[in-house]
Amino acid sequence: PLNADQKERAKAMLNRMRDVFAVNAQDLGCTNAVEHEIRLTDESPFKETTRRVPPRQLDEFKVALQDLLNSGVIKESKSPFASPVVLVRKKDNTLRVCVDFRKLNSKTIKDSYPIPRVADTLQALSGAKLFCTLDLQSGYLQVKVSEKDQPKTAMTTPFGLYQFTRMPFGLTNAPATFQRLMEYCLRDLNYKTCVVYMDDVVVFARNFDEMLVRLQEVFSRLCQYGLKLKPAKCQLFQTRIRCLGHVVSAEGIEPDPDKTAPLREWLNSPPKSAKELQTFLGFAGYYRSFVKNFSKIAEPLRRLLVSGPDKKRKQHPRPSFTWTNECQRAFETLISRLTSSPILGYPNFELPFILHIDASGEGLGAALYQTNNDKLHVIAYGSRALTTAERNYSAYRREFLALKWGITEKFRDYLYGTKCYVVTDSNPLTYLVSSAKLSPSDHRWLSALAPFDFTITYRKGKSHGDAD
């Protein structure tokens, strides 16, 4: 918590920067930095049927449309295009006007602008002790749609045809346009004083004074480009925040318990089809770096989706869906691990890393650590299943594969340019670099490892359980 002096200084700064905050839902910013364009594979228009609106929602829908008109988000249209409206309830029970843009999206040339990796975004917060999360007031609606492309956004309603002047949700390239906007606005501040992931902006600092300066910098930049924040959604001067499905603090990163809580509900109703299992594994996989040996645990479940380790669906049709006791144990173990995950530490690239590796007959395991204040902190876990060919490797070659995969693939971003101590329970692996008896493929793997600075040490298998 802030002391009395800090509160006064924070209030004074917020008062100076009050123009960055929207005063109500209709108080939208309008950026001059980018416009959203819609390039189509062919310009031939289409017209979809107006969908029926339940009579009880008609009056509410009309009010919502009028609000959009008053805000300048939409205007009446004579467009030859027409996409149907979909009405959705918000969390506060008010009506959101959405549009089914699937037909338009199918004709849209995709924008390849990259969206940041979640892991990179979170790791940029290393060393920070204070955080502020900023949320834009209907962020997409602060971006203009190019005038020539506005007719393509036309929506058909019981009250007529309207087109968007601002970028609506549902357009296939809207996320790319918004990420481009935010990175342009905060270009020299991104990853230095704040991180940007779509409409999530996190300002981070080591102390209050630094935060005050950084926050004002970000506010000034948003004002410069005509963007406004939603005050109720902004969290300022926090020591612990929720960000991208995780909880972030000075101690490290952990899964957001509110996000993983639904996993417990799955215990009462295990997946009954391949589709349900894919949904579960997709959700669980988002947090796989928190689970030691995720791939090995999930292997019985993965086998239900593919007939073999290699996904050759044409040669090997999908097996029948039979939920065995082995599947149930794997399912329960994953849920238990995900709902009691460790806090992962932030990497410090000024310190060496410690990499524990191991290989079994089914998969590879790796655990990345660093020592800080005489304590060993987990940075990340990694694992993957072996292919059919890899399962035929000798034990030594599987360990060599685990070394190459762990350093040159899984944790490359951490280990390139930093010292790494590799711990293995394979004694022959410790003689790898000096051995004269290497096959041509061994030499290729060794060449891939050459740019990395690592030392291999041996530890007996009984005390080597963390990478298994």
Predicted segments with their positions:
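Reverse-transcribing Pol proteins
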Residues: P1-Y113, C194-M198, A205, G245, ...
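Inter-domain linker/hinge segments that demarcate the starts of reverse transcriptase
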Residues: A4-A25, T49-P80, S112-L125, L130, ...
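Mobile genetic element proteins and their domesticated derivatives, centered on retroelements
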Residues: M17, E37-I38, L68, V85, ...
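Reverse-transcriptase-like RNA-dependent polymerase core
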Residues: D19-T49, Q57, V88-R96, Y113, ...
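Catalytic palm subdomain of template-directed nucleic-acid polymerases
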Residues: V88-R96, L104-D111, L141-K144, M182, ...
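A short, polar/acidic, helix/strand-boundary loop motif
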Residues: N105, G160-T177, N268, R318-P319, ...
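C-terminal reverse transcriptase regions that engage the nucleic-acid substrate
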Residues: K192, Y197, C223, A232-L351
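RNase H-like nuclease module associated with reverse transcription
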Residues: T279, G285, N392-D468
